[in-house]
């Protein structure tokens, strides 16, 4: 059984200098037969460049690292949405590991069928 059948396109965040993490996540994609993925350069809104883009956010509310992730993810979502490439998108970071998929008692299509009819966004994981 291919538990990831029906998986939407994936966009993953990766800093330009973290080629090790790029290799890790693309190795995961290869292992699981995932071919529809796009790398998003998280260096665009890196903390090192916060003086260039930090004025767009209230940095009193966010740590620079969190602000960087927010800006990269929002910009990525906007670009994806405006492209019309697909109805759904899976956004991940480059340190994700799919190893637990083999233990799922369900598959991706079951997840999609189980969502409420009017869902707009689903967060599967949060690391604090």
Identify the residue ranges that each predicted region occupies:
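An acidic/histidine-cluster motif and surrounding catalytic segment
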Residues: 1-92, 96-128
């Amino acid at each position: 059984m291919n538990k990831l059948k029906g998986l939407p396109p994936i966009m993953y965040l990766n800093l330009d200098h973290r080629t090790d993490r790029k290799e890790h996540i693309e190795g995961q994609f290869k292992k699981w037969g995932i071919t529809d993925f796009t790398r998003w350069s998280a260096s665009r809104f890196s903390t090192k460049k916060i003086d260039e883009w930090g004025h767009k956010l209230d940095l009193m509310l966010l740590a620079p690292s969190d602000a960087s992730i927010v800006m990269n993810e929002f910009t990525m979502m906007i670009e994806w949405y405006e492209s019309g490439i697909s109805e759904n998108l899976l956004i991940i970071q480059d340190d994700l590991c799919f190893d637990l998929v083999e233990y799922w008692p369900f598959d991706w299509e079951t997840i999609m069928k189980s969502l409420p009819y009017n869902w707009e966004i689903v967060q599967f994981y949060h690391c604090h």
